[in-house]
Amino acid sequence: MVFLLTALHLSTFLLREMYQIADIFEDHFAIVLFLWSLFLIPSVAVPFMSTRIARDGLLAFNVEHMKVAQVIVQVSRLLRARQTLRTLRFVAEMKIHLRENVRRNNEQVMLNVEEKPQVPLPQAPRRRSSIIPIDATATFKAARRRSSTHLDPLVTAGVLRSIQQTPLPLPVASKATFEPPLSPLAAYLTPRKQRGDAYRREMERREIHTIFCLFDVDGSVCYSQ
């Protein structure tokens, strides 16, 4: 339609307007040339601009050019890099969470140990000349028979001390050890898988660097958000 209207305008100018302008301004040839150029500008500019607009429209609404392998590869890389950034953020938050939990547990254990009463250390038993074990009950009965009316307080205290069971020291909770989580790529079955994982990590590093360069507009190697 645009080309038909342009052709109609050009034919009208060539067959009618051109001779009328020449008859009206026959004494001023410069004015005639100027008017002719003004009438010819639409006939030249409209086809050129229409061709350019049609080409851009075809490229914009063409779906086939979106199926190029390079475009798909770039989109997949961006998606994997975005997923990698989310994974790294999750790992960092999990490490901070685990460290806070370990520190809080250590502080609680130390506080519980300080609040508990200190247990006296058991005295080392004296060596006996005989290897036969001495029955504390028999010793107490013999001392009672020796003094039927009055018990020796020293002997009684020694017997009671031997009868009573020495309380065992409370076990002190061992200090909790914290190990950072290992990467799922830490264990390799074959050297080929190890090389493949190294290649994959290098590709992810390059993709993350590419995305970071998009944020780092001013070149300060940092971004606020």
Curated annotation (Swiss-Prot):
It is a single-pass type I membrane protein. The chain crosses the membrane at residues 29-49. A motif (RxLR) lies at residues 77-80. It is found in: Secreted; Host cell; Membrane. GO terms for cellular component: extracellular region; host cell; membrane. The keyword Secreted applies. Residues 1-18 form the signal peptide. Keywords: Membrane, Secreted, Signal, Transmembrane, Transmembrane helix, Virulence. Belongs to the RxLR effector family. Has the canonical translocation RxLR motif, but lacks the canonical EER motif, which characterizes most oomycete effectors identified so far. Secreted effector that completely suppresses the host cell death induced by cell death-inducing proteins. This is Secreted RxLR effector protein 160. It comes from Plasmopara viticola. The lineage of its organism: Eukaryota, Sar, Stramenopiles, Oomycota, Peronosporales. The gene is RXLR160.
